[in-house]
Swiss-Prot record:
GO terms for molecular function: acetylcholine transmembrane transporter activity. PROSITE patterns: MFS. It comes from Tetronarce californica (Pacific electric ray). The chain crosses the membrane at residues 41-61, 113-133, 140-160, 170-190, 202-222, 230-250, 272-292, 311-331, 342-362, 368-388, 405-425, 433-453. Residues 1-40, 134-139, 191-201, 251-271, 332-341, 389-404, 454-515 are cytoplasmic. This is Vesicular acetylcholine transporter. Glycans are attached at N84, N87, N92, N306.
Amino acid sequence: MGVTMAVGLAKAAMGKISSAIGERSKRISGAMNEPRRKRKILLVIVCIAMLLDNMLYMVIVPIIPNYLETIRTYKLVYITTPSNGTNGSLLNSTQRAVLERNPNANEDIQIGVLFASKAILQLLSNPFTGTFIDRVGYDIPLLIGLTIMFFSTITFAFGESYAVLFAARSLQGLGSAFADTSGIAMIADKYTEESERTQALGIALAFISFGSLVAPPFGGVLYQFAGKWVPFLVLSFVCLLDGILLLMVVTPFASRTRENMLQGTPIYKLMIDPYIAVVAGALTTCNIPLAFLEPTISNWMKKTMNASEWQMGITWLPAFFPHILGVYITVKLAAKYPNYQWFYGAVGLVIIGASSCTIPACRNFEELIIPLCALCFGIALVDTALLPTLAFLVDIRYVSVYGSVYAIADISYSVAYALGPIMAGQIVHDLGFVQLNLGMGLVNILYAPALLFLRNVCQMKPSLSERNILLEEGPKGLYDTIIMEERKAAKEPHGSSSGNHSVHAVLSDQEGYSE
């Protein structure tokens, strides 16, 4: 009897606990699916994905050269030592194993190709991933990217040969093509207000910068004291948590009506758009100094200023703070003066060019920090000003689907980071470090005037379609007419009769509309 009552009480208690947990889960789910809160959670998920991708990109900097030196540039050989008898005759011999350096192993080429393989595969994959994102939305590609990055990180943790590490690095490039493009496109899609979009993309850029700058000391410390696998396992665990959080917020594989989704513009059409091409060129140009300096500046510091290991290890760390400052300033300026995004980008290119030309003149670590900080400040200006401009260009010229246009942005970054590890060392060897920096600086300064081409586009207000600004024609089709009428009505003060225009009136009004 007592046992039966105890079982009954236990069942009742379990039922209450289960009911309470279910109710709490519903509340949490409801709170997470509240539109504004869900948008913020998705921003956090995307920022974590950006952080992980850039940490995985840079965490190998202090690890791989030392690890490859161990597994590839030394080979195990056996040396035979003869033992002579008392009368000088050879009685026996002994063998001992020693590590002998392999003179034929080209470490620089191996490391350069390994570093560049991620950007190369990312560059090749982006045209396809951009189209895929436009077709299926942003959540599924983001989940695919996080999954690929998880397996790439696990492979890095336990890989012991150059071939396995190369495969893991290339696999990360494929994951980045999905995660980076879909993540940035998701932010542009969720934050439609220009000032909010610029701020959200600025936050994502801050996480990208933080991941790139904090990863080398993070990886170096854990590698030295805990082993090669520890930093990669930590990153894979965070990647897993980010994927789980994404599944809690969205249901990527739930049934949905694809026929109601907007059809994005093909990526090849976006690539030949002159405005988008100018922005893409600026994104590539501004990242060339960073991509080419990362593999070469340490050796130059060692030869020129006899820099210590810790100085070379934290070379880029102080630059994180001016990068954040650049993001903050650009976001504030864009909110107050949104029509001058092109100007902020042009100023950033000039700062990058001047900083790059100044670097070879530095003779100690303290002097070097100043141009490096200015360099990252300029990059922040360019990225924060021009990434939202890509979404704006798609909004006013095409359909507001952002997968392909941010695939183009990712291609722009990948071009710089694919060429840097492979070409930078050879350029320094053939021409010199000074000539490399002067060339990069000159390219950035000369490209800045090209952003004047965006001046007229940036003057357009987000509520206007480019069809009646640049092409001087009215909206085509009933959908365009209704949208334009609604947008104009929203801009008119209360009491205006603009909301009662007929289709004919709207068409007539817009054919002669200029602002």
